[in-house]
């Protein structure tokens, strides 16, 4: 059997037939056989589907565009880790270099999902020189209707997240407390979370550098329809700036 990964649940697809496309819905459960999936173009009969020009063998692709949802919410693909990059850029734009207590290095690294390769190169170059490292990465949230709340229960729309524990590192509790105090002083909404997965900052721990990973809550991670709250992005940018200026 051919199985499809868990990212293919219910979401929109673009269905191409000639020069036109429809935006139907794919239905099914994750990790089920490909034959168990269907495309629903919204028609009520075979004849109605034929009238749209849809034929067996037509190709489908996942939507690639950014879509605004209700309130501050948005959906799209690859928010992990485009949101982290956006937060760093916003922090850099707002940073007051006169307030820096230390030299601060911003790194945009690549290939995290296939072995932390970009971050590992940076860690090898810098060694134990940094005081701390802060990976800006997705916090895969259980804030969705069908998710179990035991783990990763940081709510979308409630601010940035500090990772206390994940599979790659344990943040020293004193640093978690200090970060939370900084966020309170700057009136930045911050949640403390524990989760599975890992983060780029763990490549520095072998050199004795504490990894204090921060991020934002994300629904439906690694799918073409990830969901974020833009307020969380802004909170992460503010927290990144505060860390650079005052910690």
What is the predicted role of each segment?
Residues 1-247:
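N-terminal hydrophobic/helix-forming segments and targeting peptides
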């Amino acid at each position: 059997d051919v199985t499809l990964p868990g990212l293919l649940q219910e979401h929109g697809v673009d269905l191409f037939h000639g020069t036109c496309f429809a935006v139907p819905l794919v239905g099914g459960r994750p990790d089920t056989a490909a034959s168990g999936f269907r495309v629903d173009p919204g028609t009520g009969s075979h004849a109605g589907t034929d009238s749209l020009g849809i034929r067996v063998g037509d190709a489908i692709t996942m939507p690639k565009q950014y879509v605004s949802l209700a309130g501050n919410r948005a959906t799209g693909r690859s928010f992990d880790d485009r949101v982290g990059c956006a937060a760093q850029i916003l922090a850099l734009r707002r940073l007051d270099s006169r307030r820096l207590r230390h030299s601060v290095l911003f790194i945009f690294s690549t290939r995290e999902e296939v072995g932390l390769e970009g971050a590992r190169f940076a860690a090898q170059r810098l060694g134990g020189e940094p005081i701390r490292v802060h990976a800006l990465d997705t916090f895969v949230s259980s804030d969705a209707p069908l998710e179990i709340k035991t783990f990763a229960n940081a709510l979308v729309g409630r601010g940035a997240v500090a990772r206390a524990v994940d599979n790659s590192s344990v943040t020293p509790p004193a640093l978690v407390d200090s970060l939370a105090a900084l966020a309170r002083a700057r009136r930045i909404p911050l949640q403390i979370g524990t989760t599975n997965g890992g983060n780029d900052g763990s490549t520095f721990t072998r050199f004795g550098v504490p990894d204090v990973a921060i991020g934002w809550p994300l629904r439906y991670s690694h799918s073409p329809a990830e969901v974020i709250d833009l307020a969380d992005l802004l909170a992460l940018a503010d927290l990144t700036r505060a860390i650079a200026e005052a910690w």
